[in-house]
Design a protein with these regions (language model features):
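Class II aminoacyl-tRNA synthetase-like tRNA-binding/catalytic domains
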Residues: 3-175
Length: 175
């Protein structure tokens, strides 16, 4: 059964299965250290090359690669991930990522061209979370004050991909 990173504190000492994407990988002589993330957080994985047979394949993974990991959740005070890490028993690679076309330091125009990649960076995600929290707060306040929320159609001055064929709206004697 799948476990989320945020649930690991209740699963110390148990064998867990996580579905993660790779953040970073450090490959040492006898061990590999992976920071993997899911929608709820980041966790450190410790892979013993003696124990896991596909450690050579794991060493080729790039940021964004998807995998399923099974292992024991243990307390680790030296871990950067809330004092918990996973001692890996098995790791199944689901999808290998390609080299990302941008970095966090890329020019803004290039980052907008690859916006779907840019949104994977923590700073960009944080900005979206802050915006979301602000909008939720505004919405809750206004609803508590008995305002009525409604949504209006968007009217634009140019033809859109498909909506412009539905109907025309006369506006200042223009169609």
């Amino acid at each position: 059964m799948r476990t989320l990173v945020r649930e690991l504190k209740e699963k110390i000492g148990q064998t867990v299965t996580l579905y993660l994407t790779l953040e970073t990988l450090r490959d040492q002589k006898h061990l590999q250290f992976i920071l993997g993330k899911d929608k709820s957080g980041i966790i450190q994985l410790v892979i013993s090359k003696d124990k896991v047979t596909n450690h050579e394949d794991i060493g080729t993974l790039l940021q964004g690669s998807a995998f399923i990991v099974t292992g024991k959740a243990i307390e680790a005070s030296q871990s950067k991930t809330f004092g918990i890490e996973i001692q890996v028993d098995s790791l199944e690679i689901i999808s290998k990522a390609e080299v990302w076309p941008i970095t966090q330091e890329s020019a803004i125009d290039l980052r907008f061209d690859y916006r779907y990649v840019d949104l994977h960076f923590p700073k960009q995600q944080l900005m979206l979370k802050i915006r979301n929290a602000f909008l939720q707060g505004c919405r809750q306040f206004l609803l508590k004050e008995e305002f009525c929320e409604f949504t209006t159609p968007s009217l634009i001055g140019r033809a859109s991909e498909s909506g412009s064929e539905c109907f025309s709206v006369p506006y200042f004697d223009k169609i």
